[in-house]
Amino acid sequence: MALKTLQALIFLGLFAASCLAQAPAPAPITFLPPVESPSPVVTPTAEPPAPVASPPIPANEPTPVPTTPPTVSPPTTSPTTSPVASPPKPYALAPGPSGPTPAPAPAPRADGPVADSALTNKAFLVSTVIAGALYAVLA
C-alpha cells in the first residue's frame, strides 16, 4: 500500500506542478524610493570660541580668458517636398462581388480570461486531487 501512496503523491505533485505552470506571471514589482525622514533636532551645546584666524593670503590667480559669443549661421535650405510613404494596406479580405463583406474580429479582452470559466486553476487542482485519490484507491 505504501507504493500506491507514493505513486499517488508523485501523480499529485506532477499535476500540481503543471497547474502552477499555467498560472499567470506575477505583475512586476516597482520599488518606491525611500521617504526621507526629517533630521532629528540637534540641541546646541556650548562650544569654546574659535581662535582668531589670520586673514587668508590672496593667491595669484590667472585672469579668465574672455570668451567670444557664438556666431549664428544662416539657416540651411531643405528641399521643399520630402518623400512620404503611403500607409500600409490592411490584411483583411477585399469584399467580393457576390460575397458578404467580412466583419471585423472582436478585440481580445485586456483583462484576460473570465474569472468564472470552467477551467480555472482551482478547478484544475480540485480535479487533480480527486483523480489522485481515485488512483490511490483503485490502482
UniProtKB/Swiss-Prot annotation:
Chief subcellular location: membrane
Keywords: Cell membrane, Glycoprotein, GPI-anchor, Lipoprotein, Membrane, Proteoglycan, Pyrrolidone carboxylic acid, Signal
Record's GO cellular component terms: plasma membrane; side of membrane
Propiece residues: 117-139
Compartments where found: Cell membrane
This protein's record includes keyword Lipoprotein: yes
Residues anchoring lipid (GPI-anchor amidated aspartate): 116
Domain of life: Eukaryota
UniProt PTM: O-glycosylated on the hydroxyproline residues.
Membrane topology: Lipid-anchor; GPI-anchor
Tissue specificity note: Expressed at a low level in roots.
Pro residues compositional bias, start-end: 46-77, 97-107
Keyword Transmembrane tagged: no
Chain positions with Pyrrolidone carboxylic acid modification: 22
Signal peptide coordinates: 1-21
Chain residue ranges for the region called Disordered: 30-115
Family the UniProt entry places it in: Belongs to the classical AGP family.
UniProt function note: Proteoglycan that seems to be implicated in diverse developmental roles such as differentiation, cell-cell recognition, embryogenesis and programmed cell death.
UniProt-recorded name of the protein: Classical arabinogalactan protein 3
Native species: Arabidopsis thaliana (Mouse-ear cress)
